[in-house]
Amino acid sequence: MRYKTLEAFIDQVAASNPGQPEFLQATTEVIESLWPFIEQHPKYAEHGLLDRLVEPERVVMFRVSWVDDRGDVHVNRGYRIQHSSAIGPYKGGIRFHPSVNLSILKFLAFEQTFKNALTTLPMGGGKGGSDFDPKGRSPGEVMRFCQAFVSELFRHVGANTDVPAGDIGVGGREVGFMAGMMKKLSNRADCVFTGKGLSFGGSLIRPEATGYGTVYFAEEMLKRVGKSFDGLRVSVSGAGNVAQYAVEKATALGAKVVTISDSSGTVVDEDGFTPEKLAVLMDVKNHHYGRVSDYAERVGATFLPQARPWHIPVDVALPCATQNELDENDAATLIKNGAICVAEGANMPSTAKAVIAFEQSKVLYAPGKASNAGGVATSGLEMSQNSMRLSWPREEVDSRLHEIMCNIHEACVAHGGNRNGKTSYVDGANIAGFVKVADAMLAQGVV
């Protein structure tokens, strides 16, 4: 092995990527998990494999100039991280949020590579976005920004090269604007974006897929300890697409979901969600672009300003908001309150110290690369439908999604070993994803 110790490799990654804490956090977590496996299988330390694995194949950064409704010109920064094409075209979402920077997108693309490998579908890993904030912008401004963004991005993506999708700040509306501009610029109607509307090539179940998939994965985790969602108390963070459909599926399976949240605070409803309450939340968030405080006022629930949901006693926690939203103090509270299971719906929502706390406890903990892979899995199914010029019924897509999540769970269990008397889903997800990507890289030579 080129690197005698794990610390030596991490130091090299840190030195090569200064000022990128999120990327360093993600790579450290994965490599720490993989190191014992690599020591037992030294072929994965040959040919500079680890160095190549943590280095993106391509980083595209560009200026996005656009005009607001008053005629003023704004300049934002756009990115596309094409991390790995070892097992297929780059695949990963586009995020519009003021926090977007190179470190965050490199971490997301790195994680996406393993997540996509876990689905077993032929998709590489990528991620993109901009520091543009769509909140408070008119539909016309959002459209003009999306068109300006794609006027550069279109040079770097394609149905067999790189297939973006939505993410935070990028929903069906934004994907539609970008897909339309892409078609105009390229004069092609290929599947260059997933997450499209049903009227122009989208897939049924795609909006629900990440939230549904997270719950399907957690359901398999609970089955291994002889439990089900029926009658369990569940906390969900976030109130966007992932959170909404996690609430819907968990409620359908008999759980009582007692929290949702956004950046303004947390709503606690001890009576639990109902389909009617969920419809109100979707109206507030998806149509009025309001806050969870508006939802609480409409349904008579309790709103806790600037609070996170993790102090509420529950059996299952589903963090579905954003990275590093759940720290070691939150983890300690969940453990103390008797939580059985934590399954991540967001990307890396638990800090490194929180993950350690969960792994050292009796709590079943699933990292996002495994438990929230349902979104990209269904994007892969959308690509398949587009390539065949078909549209599968809702039941078929949902069935395929459920099967994929069960298979990912089985792969995690197969590679997860036994840590503290339980399966380590962290090790299982990292090793299963790594083996598929690494085997492909070794087979293709040093490229």
Where are these regions (language model features)?
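Adenosine-phosphate binding glycine-rich loop
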Residues: 1-26, 221-222, 335-447
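N-terminal ligand-binding/catalytic initiation module
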Residues: 1-205, 436-445
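Predominant activation on well-ordered alpha-helical scaffold segments within soluble catalytic domains
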Residues: 10-11, 28, 32, 102, ...
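Active-site nucleophile and cofactor-binding loops and adjacent substrate-binding regions
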Residues: 71, 167-168, 203-210, 235-239, ...
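General beta-strand structural signal in soluble alpha/beta enzymes
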Residues: 161-165, 189-193, 236, 259-262, ...
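Conserved helix-loop functional segments at active or binding sites
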Residues: 184, 219-227, 323, 332, ...
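Glycine-rich phosphate/diphosphate-binding loop of Rossmann-like nucleotide-binding domains
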Residues: 197, 202-311
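Rossmann-like adenosine-cofactor binding region
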Residues: 265-365, 370
